[in-house]
Amino acid sequence: MAIARRISRIASLIKQEISQMLLHGIKDNRVGIGMVSVTDVDVSGDLQHAKVFVSIYGSDEVRSQTMAGLRSATGYVRSELGKRIRMRRTPEVIFVEDRSLERGTEILSLLNKLSQERQQQEIEDITHKESHQDTIE
């Protein structure tokens, strides 16, 4: 239990520090072209690896350029983490694009579209029934 709490605390610290680096530290122009935010950090049980999930707002080209910039800045990020967080060994940083927010937005859009289609169908059914009853009378 204490180990899991420590891993969670370290992940939170890494998330906070990398978020600050994205705002002020990373000088690669490719990282600045898309809005980048750290959505989650997953630290391995042995504290050797940290998967940093990032959400990037922009076109596919902007996303790929931003990911390339982040991957090239991995050494700098790891070095800075070593300076900012006191640990015996700084974990290896692996950037992973997180598209869950985008997928969530797409799903909500589809659900809204289905809801509108259902409402339209119900209106058509009601008007069809009313016109059918008028012809019977």
UniProtKB/Swiss-Prot annotation:
The lineage of its organism: Bacteria, Bacillati, Cyanobacteriota, Cyanophyceae, Oscillatoriophycideae. Monomer. Binds 30S ribosomal subunits, but not 50S ribosomal subunits or 70S ribosomes. It comes from Trichodesmium erythraeum (strain IMS101). Belongs to the RbfA family. This is Ribosome-binding factor A. GO terms for cellular component: cytosol. NCBIfam families: rbfA. Keywords: Cytoplasm, Ribosome biogenesis. The keyword Cytoplasm applies.
